[in-house]
């Protein structure tokens, strides 16, 4: 029996995780980053950019459901949604399940990611790239929100970690542009890393977002691939009530949507805003 190739993630210098590689489906350096898609017995197809795992078939639903349904159901009447990043198509798939949404714009810096993922991760997008409400823009996210004249009800930043091309999506320029592009009553959410290991990222985002939004917080979910504990998602709006929607209202909205989820429930939604004390203390000490 031949020994399987081992792929090591390089996100952290002193510790990490590895994956056995059953088969490499694609590996190439695009114009912006090094992209690999391979098969793993336990997690299915795995995509990594610049040595960091972005998504796996086995657990992607947790990430995509939480980053989509929490803001959309909190808003309650989102018509226009902007996705920054999200080239694997999972976020688009979940947003497109909301039939009340009339227009979905996705801004992806790397056209290669979209092409490769449509071919090698078809279950992520599940045909949503063909949704007539969808518009794909190949551009840098910061540049787009700086120049865009359109307004959106929900903005989802499905960004990579703040290294390489994803670094700009954690800057004040980006957050300011997103605030400018939101309609009144709009909500901004973003991937913000595993807070036990990447606490500085959460503190930095909280500080920067606070300059442009009246209500800034985080919510969380545990996603096995993103090891180290709970992953945090940044939340920003100018209406604190949107973060405190009652369970009855959420249940009604969720039932009316007709959406069936594998992770998200209205109760999970409410509980996700309960944060561990170590993060609350770090945010408080940074003020």
Curated annotation (Swiss-Prot):
A Pfam entry, by short name: Spermine_synt_N
Q: Where does spermidine bind?
A: 64, 88, 158-161
Is the keyword Transferase assigned to this protein? yes
The protein's name? Polyamine aminopropyltransferase
Q: Per its database record, what is this protein's job?
A: Catalyzes the irreversible transfer of a propylamine group from the amino donor S-adenosylmethioninamine (decarboxy-AdoMet) to putrescine (1,4-diaminobutane) to yield spermidine.
What's the domain of life for this entry?
Bacteria
**Molecular-function annotations in GO:** spermidine synthase activity
On subunit structure and binding partners, the annotation says: Homodimer or homotetramer.
Q: What cellular component GO annotations does this protein have?
A: cytosol
Q: Keywords in UniProt for this one?
A: Cytoplasm, Polyamine biosynthesis, Spermidine biosynthesis, Transferase
| Catalytic site | 158
Segments forming domain PABS: 5-238
Which catalysed reactions does the entry list for this protein? S-adenosyl 3-(methylsulfanyl)propylamine + putrescine = S-methyl-5'-thioadenosine + spermidine + H(+)
Which residues hold S-methyl-5'-thioadenosine?
33, 108, 140-141, 165
Compartments reported by the entry: Cytoplasm
């Amino acid at each position: 029996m031949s020994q399987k190739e081992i792929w090591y993630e390089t996100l952290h210098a002193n510790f990490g995780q590895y994956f056995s590689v059953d088969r490499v489906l694609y590996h190439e350096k695009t114009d912006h980053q090094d992209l690999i898609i391979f098969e793993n017995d336990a997690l299915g197809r795995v995509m990594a950019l610049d040595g960091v795992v972005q998504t796996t078939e086995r657990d992607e639903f947790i990430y995509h459901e939480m980053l989509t349904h929490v803001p959309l159901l909190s808003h309650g009447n989102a018509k226009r949604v902007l996705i920054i990043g999200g080239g694997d198509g999972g976020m688009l798939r979940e947003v497109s399940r909301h039939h009340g949404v009339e227009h979905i714009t996705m801004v992806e810096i790397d056209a290669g990611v979209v092409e490769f993922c449509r071919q090698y991760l078809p279950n992520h997008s599940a045909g949503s790239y063909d949704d007539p409400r969808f518009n794909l823009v190949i551009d840098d996210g910061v540049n787009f929100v700086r120049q865009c004249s359109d307004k959106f009800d929900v903005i989802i930043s499905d960004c990579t970690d703040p290294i390489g091309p994803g670094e700009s999506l954690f800057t004040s320029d980006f957050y300011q542009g997103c605030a400018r592009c939101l309609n009144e009553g709009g909500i901004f959410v973003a991937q913000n890393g595993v807070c036990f290991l990447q606490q500085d990222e959460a503190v930095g985002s909280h500080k920067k977002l606070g300059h442009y939004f009246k209500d800034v917080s985080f919510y969380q979910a545990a996603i096995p691939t993103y090891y180290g504990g709970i992953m945090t998602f940044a939340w920003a709006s100018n209406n604190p009530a949107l973060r405190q929607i009652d369970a009855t209202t959420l249940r009604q909205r969720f039932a009316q949507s007709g959406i069936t989820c594998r992770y998200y429930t209205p109760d999970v939604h409410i509980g996700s805003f309960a944060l561990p004390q170590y993060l609350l203390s770090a945010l408080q000490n940074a003020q």
